[in-house]
């Protein structure tokens, strides 16, 4: 017994020594990690590097960021201020909040900072994209791509977008059970991008497979850039390769078949615009361009669409006020038949309350957290030095949350954007859901158009109810969305705004 007791004590002592050694090793390595980045400050500048933590060696604070969601930024902002350092997705990063700080970054493009997304994002989207280009190459690409989102182009997309949304809402209403809104919104925006924007005639079965692959791609766009088996980055690469094969096949088929089209889609405009600027696009450039267009139209628009539906559920008075505006304009139609062509851009621009609703959704539930830049030369920001070579992320969502021009920032209140209050009129950089400066989102008008049409069709043709006891919590990666997708039961409406039972809706859908 004595020897057994001594052996147990010895084992415990050994275990304790190992734990102490590991703890000391972690503490020392973490301290060296902090010193390693502190040594990168610009010695010619007397200002200090922003406060903050670089987390653990190699992984930094990536784990905290993924687990804490919006709490990560807010907790560190409260502790360190509007400018703080961290280490995310394999690189050192300074996160910036506040209109004046963001203005300096956005207006400093090409001389203070240059765009640089995380390595995983750059590699997965591809080198030929607008988002990854800089300088003259970026300016030239924007000129080529800008025609895709011109007033004339948007007018031609509008009837097709309206039909896709009508068909989708009819299918939602005919479904006997509640649907996962976020998942279905992803399918809707993906279908819109493939069918309307790009004009691809992909069979339904192939489209479903392509959607699943694209989901895998998007889920790993913001991942640690570690190319190992079973890593998120490796899954993203594999998804990209599969998508590129599918896109090349669709592009070649589309280029060979030009008959029977009643409008020019985005891919047609892109090819023609490129020729007008004296450049014939290669197949690789076309594949990267279409992949970027789908990415831009898919993830962020699905996020905003889900947020729109969630807020209309939470605020029935807002939905009723929207219906009143549509009724006054003669736009509150029945969902019993397709109404292609009933909406025009000038009609939508005259719906002022609808515009306020969309603006408020984008203020309170901005799909993306912010934008990334790399520092070209050391500069001052909020009393700190921002060293050359570091990365900077300007925070859109937190700038909205802390903007002094907005009253009761956590309250969903579309009237804040009405003519009587116009809270966004003071300060250009307090409200920037689509970024700003020379890299303002090219597709912002298409995104707003889609959301407005969705809101009009929801108000006209649907009643919807939350299918769970409480609303789901929100996560921010890769874009803002409900954790459990938002379970909602939809019902169709007749011409008198009365519910249509699912079985009746199914019969109506079968006859359309």
Swiss-Prot record:
Subcellular location: Endoplasmic reticulum membrane; Microsome membrane
Database matches in InterPro entries: Cyt_P450, Cyt_P450_CS, Cyt_P450_E_grp-IV, Cyt_P450_sf
GO cellular component: endoplasmic reticulum membrane
Keywords: Endoplasmic reticulum, Heme, Iron, Lipid metabolism, Membrane, Metal-binding, Microsome, Monooxygenase, Oxidoreductase
Enzymatic class: oxidoreductase
A GO BP annotation: retinoic acid receptor signaling pathway
UniProt-annotated binding residues for heme: 441
Gene3D superfamilies documented for this protein: Cytochrome P450
Reactions accelerated catalytically: all-trans-retinoate + reduced [NADPH--hemoprotein reductase] + O2 = all-trans-4-hydroxyretinoate + oxidized [NADPH--hemoprotein reductase] + H2O + H(+); all-trans-retinoate + reduced [NADPH--hemoprotein reductase] + O2 = all-trans-18-hydroxyretinoate + oxidized [NADPH--hemoprotein reductase] + H2O + H(+)
Recorded superkingdom: Eukaryota
EC numbers for this chain: 1.14.13.-
Cofactor(s) required for function per UniProt: heme
Annotated membrane topology: Peripheral membrane protein
Principal cellular location given in the protein's record: endoplasmic reticulum
Sample GO molecular function, one term: retinoic acid binding
Family: Belongs to the cytochrome P450 family.
Purpose of the protein: A cytochrome P450 monooxygenase involved in the metabolism of retinoates (RAs), the active metabolites of vitamin A, and critical signaling molecules in animals. RAs exist as at least four different isomers: all-trans-RA (atRA), 9-cis-RA, 13-cis-RA, and 9,13-dicis-RA, where atRA is considered to be the biologically active isomer, although 9-cis-RA and 13-cis-RA also have activity.
Descriptive protein name: Cytochrome P450 26B1
Lineage: Eukaryota, Metazoa, Chordata, Craniata, Vertebrata
Gene: CYP26B1
